[in-house]
């Protein structure tokens, strides 16, 4: 993919190996709001039972960014195989035509998906008011 030329930086990860990043992604990662994810455990109190389960939302988010690219790359490879086998003009044959900015948007969405989480946030979701409870103050979409 043409996007490969945009990946100018690397982070070494014990799970995913080398995670390649764009200049824009580095800027997002270096922002204090993203850096705070280093101090939020991904698995909350699970480390009390499994002492080695101590990775942060920061590391998790980097992994999700990496996996989003892996998924896109596998879609591309499968499209090539599909096109060779069937050559029927199916939409899969056009996956290489995804614009670079859309690939970057996908990667940034993956990177930033946990930015709003606080500590033990999933544990408190059941106590949070649902959308229907705000219906009197929120406009109906």
Where are each of the predicted segments found?
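Sequence-structural signature of the catalytic-core scaffold of metal-dependent phosphohydrolases
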Residues: 1-41, 45-108, 116-141
């Amino acid at each position: 993919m043409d996007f490969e030329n945009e990946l100018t930086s690397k982070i070494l990860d014990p799970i995913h190996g080398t995670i390649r990043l764009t200049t824009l992604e580095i800027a997002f990662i270096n922002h204090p709001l993203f850096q705070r994810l280093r101090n939020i455990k991904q698995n909350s109190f699970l480390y009390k039972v499994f002492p080695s389960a101590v990775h942060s939302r920061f590391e998790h988010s980097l992994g999700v960014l990496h996996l989003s690219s892996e998924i896109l790359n596998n879609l591309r490879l499968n499209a090539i195989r599909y096109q060779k086998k069937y050559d029927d003009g199916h939409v899969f044959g056009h996956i290489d035509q995804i614009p670079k900015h859309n690939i970057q948007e996908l990667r940034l969405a993956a990177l930033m998906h946990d930015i709003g989480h606080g500590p033990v946030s999933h544990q408190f979701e059941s106590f949070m008011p649902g959308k229907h409870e705000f219906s009197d103050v929120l406009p109906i979409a």
